[in-house]
Amino acid sequence: MKNFETLFAELSEKAATRPAGSRTVAELESGVHGIGKKVVEEAAEVWMAAEYESDEAAAEEISQLLYHLQVLMLAKGLTLEDVYKHL
């Protein structure tokens, strides 16, 4: 099972190596604006799932939001430590 740190490490590797066909690479290439739009979309899906769907559906949507937030972090050159210091 992945956790926040292992996901970030995996995404960082993909950002560095740019494997062909990678969803992460495609999203990074869409830039901060494109990634930001995806974050907003996923946040709305989290809300709707939490409000109207099962806990399992909400957890899945939250995991997708976390993925897109981490891609945004990579696009901005932010590390986990950059974020953790604000928690």
Curated annotation (Swiss-Prot):
This protein's record includes keyword Amino-acid biosynthesis: yes
Reactions the enzyme catalyzes: 1-(5-phospho-beta-D-ribosyl)-ATP + H2O = 1-(5-phospho-beta-D-ribosyl)-5'-AMP + diphosphate + H(+)
One of the protein's GO biological processes: L-histidine biosynthetic process
Highest taxon of source: Bacteria
GO terms for cellular component: cytoplasm
Pathway: Amino-acid biosynthesis; L-histidine biosynthesis; L-histidine from 5-phospho-alpha-D-ribose 1-diphosphate: step 2/9
SUPFAM superfamilies, alphabetized: all-alpha NTP pyrophosphatases (SSF101386)
Keywords from the UniProt entry: Amino-acid biosynthesis, ATP-binding, Cytoplasm, Histidine biosynthesis, Hydrolase, Nucleotide-binding
Entry's EC annotation: 3.6.1.31
GO molecular function: ATP binding; phosphoribosyl-ATP diphosphatase activity
Compartments, record wording: Cytoplasm
Coiled-coil segments on the chain, per record: none
Classification via Pfam families: PRA-PH
Family indicated by similarity: Belongs to the PRA-PH family.
Stored HAMAP family: HisE (MF_01020)
Protein name: Phosphoribosyl-ATP pyrophosphatase
Source organism: Arthrobacter sp. (strain FB24)
